[in-house]
Amino acid sequence: MVLCPVIGKLLHKRVVLASASPRRQEILSNAGLRFEVVPSKFKEKLDKASFATPYGYAMETAKQKALEVANRLYQKDLRAPDVVIGADTIVTVGGLILEKPVDKQDAYRMLSRLSGREHSVFTGVAIVHCSSKDHQLDTRVSEFYEETKVKFSELSEELLWEYVHSGEPMDKAGGYGIQALGGMLVESVHGDFLNVVGFPLNHFCKQLVKLYYPPRPEDLRRSVKHDSIPAADTFEDLSDVEGGGSEPTQRDAGSRDEKAEAGEAGQATAEAECHRTRETLPPFPTRLLELIEGFMLSKGLLTACKLKVFDLLKDEAPQKAADIASKVDASACGMERLLDICAAMGLLEKTEQGYSNTETANVYLASDGEYSLHGFIMHNNDLTWNLFTYLEFAIREGTNQHHRALGKKAEDLFQDAYYQSPETRLRFMRAMHGMTKLTACQVATAFNLSRFSSACDVGGCTGALARELAREYPRMQVTVFDLPDIIELAAHFQPPGPQAVQIHFAAGDFFRDPLPSAELYVLCRILHDWPDDKVHKLLSRVAESCKPGAGLLLVETLLDEEKRVAQRALMQSLNMLVQTEGKERSLGEYQCLLELHGFHQVQVVHLGGVLDAILATKVAP
C-alpha cells in the first residue's frame, strides 16, 4: 500500500516501458503502474572497456534505450510521452560483464564461470521525462543503478546442461532466471531479489520520491532520511499546489483552551478517518482487469487472422484502414479499430502512411510464414472458442462439449469432431503442424538420441517433428504413424530436402493396428487427449513393441505436483476438459504410468516454452 501514492504520481501520465522483458512488465504491473510497452531498438554495442565501472555501462545502456524510444515516438506522431523508463541488467564476475548468451554453448560457458562463485547483478535504470517546445523534444534524465550479490552452488556438468537444454537461459543476462528453474542454482542472495529478476522496484520508488516529493523544510529539521520510502501519511500531506485557506478573522466565544482541545479532537478524528481510508483501500486490480477483459484482445487477434489482415500487409508498403477494409469486405471504421488494437498489442506498426506488419506478424501470423501459427489460430477461432462458451457445462458434467458445439454426440472423438470433413481435418492438421514446427527443434535436441537408429512418431500427423529428428540425426530412419485420413494429406506438408529419404509414412489406428517397429517411440502431445484407461492401453501396446533398451519419448505440458503454479499446464488441462476425454498430468503421474509398463531410467527436460520432454528406457521384465 505504501507504494500506491508514489506510483500514483504517474497514474494520469503516458508512461512507456522501453523493454520487451515480460519480467519487468510483471514487476511494474504488480506495483500498480499503468504503462505502454515499446521495446527499444537501440543496438547494445557500447564499448564496455570505455566505462570505469560495470554499472556505468548498465546505466548508459538503459538511458540510450529510453531515449531511442522517446525520440522514435515523438517523430512518429509529434506527441511526446510523459515518461519513458529504460532498464538494462548485467551480470559481472571477476570483472567480466555477462549479458544474454548467444547460443547454448555460450550459456554453458557463462554458467560454468558462475558455478561455486559469488557474482554481482547490476541493473541500470533511466527515467526520462519528456516534453516538447517549439516542435522540439526536450528530455530530462534521472538514472540510478542497483547491485545485488548472488552466490551459486557448486554445479555439476550434468545439471548445467540440463538447465541449458531447458531453454530458460537464452533470454536472460548471465544465462539464468532466478525466479524460475534458475533458482535451483542459487545458494544465497544479498540485496534486492527483484533486481536479479530484472527491475529494482524498491529503488525505483525511492527515485520517484526524490523526483516528485522533494524534502520539505520540516522534514529536514526532523532529519528525515530520503533514501527510504516515506510513510503513507507523508504523501497525503503533499500536493501539487501548496497553500491552504486563511484563518477566520472573527473568533467564536469560548476559551482558547476549549478551542484548542476541540481542534485537536477534530484533527485526531480526521486523521483517524484518513488512516482508516488508506488502510482499507485495496490496490488497484490491474492484473484482475486484464484477466476479465483479456478475451477481447484474444478475439481481436483471432479476427484479424480470420480476415487475413497480416497476409494483406506482408511484404507490402503501409496501407490505410479504408484500403484494407475494401479488400476484405469490411467497414472502414470497424477495420480502423481492429488495426489500432493490433498496433497497440505490438502486432502492427502504425505511421502516417498507414499500417504495416511487425516482424512478429510476418513470421507467425501471416498464413504462408515458415513458422506460421495461422492454422493454430484458426483452430482456436473456429472450434476452441465455441467449446469454451460451454465451459460451465463441461465443469458441471465433467465431459467435453463437442455435442453442444457441433449439435451432435461425437461417438469417435477425432473422426467426428476433428476429421468430420476434409476442411475440418485440414484445419486441425494445419494447427498441429504450426505448433509442432515451433517446438520441434527443442524436442529433437532435448536429449542425445543418437543411439537410436530408428524412430516411430505415433500420431505424428504432418511429420513436422519427424523431419526435425531426421535433420538432427542423419542416421535415423523415422516412421510417421497416423490414421489413414491424416496420412493421405500429410505429404502436402513435407517440403523437399535431404531429410525426405529418412522419413516414411504408415497408416493405422494406434489403438488397434500393429505399431511399426522402431528403437525409439515418440508420443508428442498424444497422451493428454485420453483418459487413464486408454493411456494404459496405448502404453501397453508401445511396451509390447519395444525390445529391452528401446526408448520412449513423451512430450507433454507438465503440471506441477501440487497443481498450483504451472499456469499454462493448468490452462491446458481445462482445455482438455472441453475438447477431449483427457487431461494434463504431472511428472509423478507420468513416471508411475511409465514404470507400470516397464519403462525406467526416467529423465525430464523442461523445454522453457510450452512443453516438457520425458525420456524413458524399456527394461527387461
Curated annotation (Swiss-Prot):
Effect caused by changing K65A: Loss of pyrophosphatase activity
Sequence positions bearing Phosphothreonine: T234
HAMAP family reported in the protein's UniProt record:
Maf (MF_00528)
Task: State how the cofactor is bound.
Answer: Pyrophosphatase activity requires a divalent metal cation.
Q: Where is this site: Important for substrate specificity?
A: R23, T89, Q179
What is the gene called? ASMTL
- Report the coiled-coil segments: none
Question: So what does mutating D88 to A/N actually do?
Answer: Loss of pyrophosphatase activity
Kindly give any further remark recorded in the entry.
The gene coding for this protein is located in the pseudoautosomal region 1 (PAR1) of X and Y chromosomes. It represents a unique fusion product of 2 different genes of different evolutionary origin and function. The N-terminus is homologous to the bacterial maf/orfE genes and the C-terminus is homologous to ASMT. Exon duplication, exon shuffling and gene fusion seem to be common characteristics of the PAR1 region.
Q: Which domain of life is it from?
A: Eukaryota
This entry's Gene Ontology molecular function terms read: dTTP diphosphatase activity; nucleoside triphosphate diphosphatase activity; O-methyltransferase activity; protein dimerization activity; UTP diphosphatase activity
Q: How would you summarize where this protein is expressed among tissues?
A: Widely expressed. In adult, highly expressed in pancreas, placenta, fibroblast, thymus, prostate, testis, ovary and colon. Expressed at lower levels in spleen, small intestine and leukocytes. In fetus, expressed at high levels in the lung and kidney and at lower level in brain and liver.
The UniProt record lists the EC number as: 3.6.1.9, 2.1.1.-
| Upper taxonomic lineage | Eukaryota, Metazoa, Chordata, Craniata, Vertebrata
Region (Disordered) residue ranges read 235-279
NCBIfam families under this entry?
A: maf
Question: Keywords, A to Z?
Answer: Hydrolase, Methyltransferase, Nucleotide metabolism, Phosphoprotein, S-adenosyl-L-methionine, Transferase
**Full protein name:** Probable bifunctional dTTP/UTP pyrophosphatase/methyltransferase protein
Give the residue ranges for region: MAF-like: 11-223
